[in-house]
From Swiss-Prot:
InterPro entries: AN1-like_Znf, Znf_AN1, Znf_C2H2_type. SMART domains: ZnF_AN1, ZnF_C2H2. This is Zinc finger AN1 and C2H2 domain-containing stress-associated protein 16. GO terms for cellular component: cytoplasm. Coiled coil: none annotated. Induction: By cold, dehydration and salt stress. It comes from Oryza sativa subsp. japonica. The lineage of its organism: Eukaryota, Viridiplantae, Streptophyta, Embryophyta, Tracheophyta. Zn(2+) 3 binds at C101, C106, C126, H129. Keywords: Metal-binding, Repeat, Stress response, Zinc, Zinc-finger. The gene is SAP16.
């Protein structure tokens, strides 16, 4: 068996009448014997263990599921076990019913290659009705409103009307009425605040106008006022005469009053303190002590 280069090449067939050497032998997965190409099947070499791993699957007519029959078990027992535990008749429609195009009058079966999903209505159609006008597409869904508070009020009002008609829904009626009451009170308080602000502004403007008119009526024609006293005069000449009589003497007396600094050593008088300091430093050696 084999050659000098490959002494273990090839094996003899296990069938007694054959015993043929095969360089590519087959090993049976049931009896683990080696056979040639002619006797590789179970029936050709009459394998005694052929039925041990036999696989038989039956399709259930109720649920369209596969039921595997066990080799060492009665098929009736296996079938009863499936019917009492795993059988689901609702699965039959899912498996056997083929998906078709939803357009009325179209009987096209939808498969992997001819199915198109519409972006607007998100439904699957065949290639013939893939465009919106062909399958009467309703268009994209409208976006929700950007005012959730208003929608909440409308929903609460609808809920309240429904609760009035149906006395059993007392809980939803209470929540909707509470929300509506809160919104109404918030609106009324805002309106009251705006009304108060408008009233206060009007009163302030009226008071300012009244003050201006009162001051002008009290002063009459006295438009010239003295800068040194609160006296008022009708003409500039009267104001000048008042200043000369009442405030001229005070200005002259203030001018006649002159501060004099006296040297403590020589009793020399100086009007400017700087001159006194220079005199002391120059004539008395920088000291003012006697």
């Amino acid at each position: 068996m084999g050659t000098p280069e490959f002494p273990n090449l090839g094996k003899h067939c296990s069938v007694g009448d054959c015993n043929q050497i095969d360089f590519l032998p087959f090993t049976c997965d049931r009896c683990d014997h080696v056979f040639c190409l002619q006797h590789r099947s179970y029936t050709s070499h009459q394998c005694p263990n052929a039925n041990q791993k036999d696989v038989t699957v039956l399709i259930c007519p109720l649920c369209a599921k596969g039921v595997r029959l066990n080799p060492n078990e009665d098929p009736n027992i296996t079938w009863d076990t499936h019917v009492n535990s795993d059988c689901d008749p609702s699965n039959y429609q899912k498996v056997t019913k083929k998906k078709k195009c939803p357009v009325p009058g179209c009987r096209e079966t939808l498969t992997f290659s001819n199915t198109i999903r519409c972006k607007d209505c998100t439904k699957e159609h065949c290639l013939k009705h893939r465009f919106g006008p062909d399958h009467k597409c309703p268009g994209p869904r409208k976006p929700e409103s950007t005012f959730p508070f208003g929608n909440m009020l409308r929903r609460s009002q609808k809920a309240e009307s429904c609760s009035n008609s149906n006395s059993s829904s007392t809980s939803s009626s209470w929540w909707s009425s509470s929300l509506l009451t809160a919104a109404t009170s918030f609106k009324s308080s805002a309106e009251a605040g705006m009304q108060k602000l408008s009233t206060a502004t009007t009163q302030a403007i009226q008071k300012a106008k009244d003050g201006i008119s009162t001051s002008s009526s009290n002063s009459g024609d006295l438009v010239e006022q003295c800068v040194q006293c609160p006296a008022r005069f009708s003409t500039v000449g009267a104001l000048i005469e008042h200043c000369e009589k009442s405030h001229q003497s005070n200005s002259q007396s203030s001018r006649s009053r002159v501060t004099v600094d006296v040297c403590p050593k020589c009793s020399k008088a100086f009007r400017d303190p700087v001159l006194l300091v220079e005199h002391v430093e120059r004539d008395h050696g920088g000291t003012s002590r006697a």
